[in-house]
From Swiss-Prot:
Keywords: Aminoacyl-tRNA synthetase, ATP-binding, Cytoplasm, Ligase, Nucleotide-binding, Protein biosynthesis, RNA-binding. The keyword RNA-binding applies. It comes from Sodalis glossinidius (strain morsitans). ATP binds at residue 238. GO terms for cellular component: cytosol. A motif ('HIGH' region) lies at residues 42-51. This is Tyrosine--tRNA ligase. Residues 357-414 form the S4 RNA-binding domain. One of its GO terms (molecular function) is tyrosine-tRNA ligase activity.
Amino acid sequence: MASSNLIQQLQERGLIAQVTDEKALAERLAAGPIALYCGFDPTADSLHLGHLVPLLCLKRFQLAGHRPVALVGGATGLIGDPSFKATERKLNTAETVQEWVEKIKRQVSPFLDFDCGDNSAVAANNYDWFGSMNVLTFLLDIGKHFSVNQMINKEAVKQRLNRDDSGISFTEFSYNLLQGYDFACLNKQYGVALQIGGSDQWGNITSGIDLTRRLHQNTVYGLTVPLITKADGTKFGKTEGGAVWLDPSKTSPYKFYQFWINTADSDVYLFLKFFTFLDLAAIDALEQEDRASDKAPRAQYVLAEEVTRMVHGEQGLAAAKRITASLFSGALADLTEDDFAQLAQDGMPTVHLERVADLQQALVAAELVPSRGQARTLISSNAVSVNGEKQASIDYVFDDADRLYSRYTLLRRGKKHYCLLNWQ
C-alpha cells in the first residue's frame, strides 16, 4: 500500500469517516514517512472488535512505510471518555487500570512490527506524562489553551449536557484536555503528525490538533474511521452473550470464528474491506463468484479465516475450524481436550454428572427434555446422539468409552441442541 495513494485506498475501502485537510495530508504522506498514533483506553481487561478497525488502520500505515505509535491510556483510562456516552463511566482503581494497561499492550503488539528499522512501532502510555503532573501545571500549561465555550459546544459533550437525567462531571469534562495533550506530547517526542481513531473521537482529535499548533507551532492532522454498523441496523460486535473480545480467554477462537461465519450476506463484502488486507480486486471477484453460484457464499468463510488467523494465529484458527467441522459432522474424534474446554467456556450448556447415570437422566439434567417420559419418546424417535452417534436404546447407560478424555460426553437433541456432560 504505497504512501502516495494511501488516502485514496483507504477511501476506496470505506475506511475514512472524516479527515482534516485531506489534500494537505495526502501531500504530506507522499512527501515521506510520518509518525501517527491511535489511543486505546483500558476500560476493560481486553480490547474488543470495536478496536480492531483503528488498530488495523495503524498496521495499514506501517505497511506503507509510516511509523505507528500505539498509545495505551494509563491516565485517561482512569478518567473515562464521555464522548457520546449516556452516563458517566464507573471509575476503576489505579491498580486495576494498570493491570489492564499491561494486558492491552500485549494484545496490540502482535498486530504491529516493533523491529523493522525506521518505521518500527512504538508502544506508549500517557500515564508517563500525566502521572507526575500537578494541578497547577495542568491548568497553566494546558487549561489556558482551551475555551470552555468551544468545549461545551462539541457534540459529544453537548449530548450529555442536554440530558435531564445526567449531566457531566468535571472529571469527564477534562478528558478532552488530556487527549489533546497526548497529541502534543507525542508530536514533541516522536514527531507524530497524525492521530487516527473512531468517528466518536473527532472532537478530541481536533482539540489535539489545535493544542499542538499552539504549543509547538506544528501542523498536524486527524483522521477517523467509521463506527461499524450492520445493514440491519443492529450493533456490530455484539452477540447474545455480550461483546466479542480479542482475548481468547473471554471469547474463544471458536466463538470468534463463528461470529464471522454468521455475518449477513449484506455485510460480508464490506467487512472484508474493513477487517482484512485482501485487495479490492480479490474481494470484488469473490462477490461476483458468490452471486453467480447456487451454493452457499464463500465470503463468510474467507472473512472468518482471515480475521481469526490475524487475531488468534494459525493454531487458534485450526482449533476453531476443527470444532466447527466436528460439530457439523458429528465426528468428535478429532477434538482435543482443550477444544471441549473451549465449548464449555463459550457457553455451551454444561452439566456435571456422577459416574453412574443413564441417557434418560442425562437428557433431563441437561434440560434437553423436561421429563424421563419425553426422554424415552425422543430416544425412540432416533433424535438423540451421544458423541455424534445416534442412540435409540431407551435403557442406555453410559460407559467409559462415552467419556472422552475420561471427562466429556456431547449430547445432541435433533440438529442444533447440544449439551456437554462433564463427568465427576
